[in-house]
């Protein structure tokens, strides 16, 4: 009788072999993740650059129609307030005014033009509420991890953005009759220049400020807009696109606090109402609590910020840029040749 053949058993992986395979997979994932993250950030940075270019082109279109760049913010009279909860100081800001030129004509035509008063109505005006809670494609940079958290002051919820108009080194004084003189000291050397940027605050009578042709230093040599980061918490108003005050949708007053460059970490690099203080420095959001008088360009990109120049081109400004070069890029009429590093 023929004996039955014993079935041949298939040999499986040993525990050690499985652990080796898992370890190899983990190493490969560890090697790939940074590359994937770099690709994602590169794509986000390009998206931010494209957004800035769209804002710059919209500002040019506004000038073609109105005769000048949009004001940083329209204010009630000759004086203005910068405290975010003092709504008597608010009027439409530059972003609100150029909505029709950035594919947001319905929002402007249906809501902005229907606001009966910009003063003391943030709680009750339905149209004003629709404007400040609007979120649209060009307003935010995908690199900012906090721009989805709304600001919760001044009467309710305000959507964040990541782009700001440049008031120049004189910043807070950048209004129709404000001072343009600016002096700063670097390494013991004091330099004076005209610190006005392309944008400033105007009264109700004027809905325009400087023209591109009025940028005496050359439109390609002057920052028109830059990136900013959203505030750290719901009471930090930085990055609110519908507000015109410094830190929300405008930057400036570089010389009023500490020596500033993009993404400065020191506590005086931004002076903002309800600033969270020293906890902000590690996140490129250094600030001190005070009225909104100082804010610098900021981004979540490694090593610098995107900035749209007056001619509509977008440049990446390194965090390592010198104070002098940054100040001169921020001024539209200082009359000084740019340092080589700024070109």
Give each language-model segment a name.
Residues 1-15, 79-80:
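N-terminal leader/signal peptides at the extreme start of proteins
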Residues 9-44, 48, 54:
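N-terminal single-pass transmembrane signal-anchor helix
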Residues 16, 56, 60, 95-103, ...:
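Non-transmembrane alpha-helical segments in soluble domains
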Residues 48-51, 94, 325:
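Stable alpha-helical elements in mature extracytoplasmic
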Residues 52-66:
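N-terminal alpha-helical signal peptides/signal-anchor transmembrane segments
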Residues 68-240:
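Ligand-binding/active-site lining segments
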Residues 112, 120, 167-343:
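Hydrophobic alpha-helical interface faces used for helix-helix packing
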């Amino acid at each position: 009788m023929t004996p039955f053949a014993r079935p041949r058993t298939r040999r499986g992986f040993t525990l050690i072999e499985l652990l080796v395979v898992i370890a190899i997979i983990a190493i490969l994932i560890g090697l790939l993740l940074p590359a994937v993250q770099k690709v994602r950030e590169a794509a986000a940075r390009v998206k931010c650059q494209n957004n800035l270019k769209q804002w710059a082109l919209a500002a040019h279109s506004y000038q073609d129609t109105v005769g000048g760049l949009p004001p940083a913010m329209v204010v009630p009279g000759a004086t203005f307030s910068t405290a975010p909860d003092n709504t008597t100081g608010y009027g439409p800001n530059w972003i609100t005014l150029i909505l029709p030129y950035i594919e947001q004509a319905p929002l402007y035509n249906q809501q902005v033009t229907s606001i009966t008063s910009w003063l003391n109505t943030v709680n009750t005006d339905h149209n004003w509420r629709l404007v400040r809670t609007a979120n649209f494609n060009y307003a935010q940079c995908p690199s900012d991890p906090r721009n989805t958290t709304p600001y919760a002051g001044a009467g309710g919820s305000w959507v964040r953005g990541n782009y700001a108009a440049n008031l120049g080194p004189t910043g807070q004084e950048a209004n129709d009759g404000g001072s343009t003189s600016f002096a700063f000291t670097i390494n013991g050397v004091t330099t004076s220049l005209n610190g006005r940027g392309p944008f400033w605050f105007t009264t109700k009578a004027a809905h325009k400020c400087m023209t591109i042709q009025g940028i005496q230093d050359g439109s390609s040599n002057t920052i028109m807009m830059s990136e900013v980061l959203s505030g750290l918490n719901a009471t930090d108003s930085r990055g609110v696109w519908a507000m015109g005050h410094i830190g929300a949708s405008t930057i400036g007053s570089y010389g009023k606090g500490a020596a500033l460059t993009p993404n400065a970490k020191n506590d005086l690099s931004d002076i903002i109402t309800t600033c969270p203080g020293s906890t902000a420095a590690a996140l490129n959001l250094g600030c001190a609590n005070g009225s909104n008088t100082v804010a610098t360009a900021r981004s979540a990109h490694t090593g610098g910020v995107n900035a749209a120049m007056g001619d509509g081109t977008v440049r990446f400004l390194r965090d390592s840029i010198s104070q002098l070069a940054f100040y001169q890029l921020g001024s539209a009429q200082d009359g000084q040749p740019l340092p080589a590093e700024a070109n």
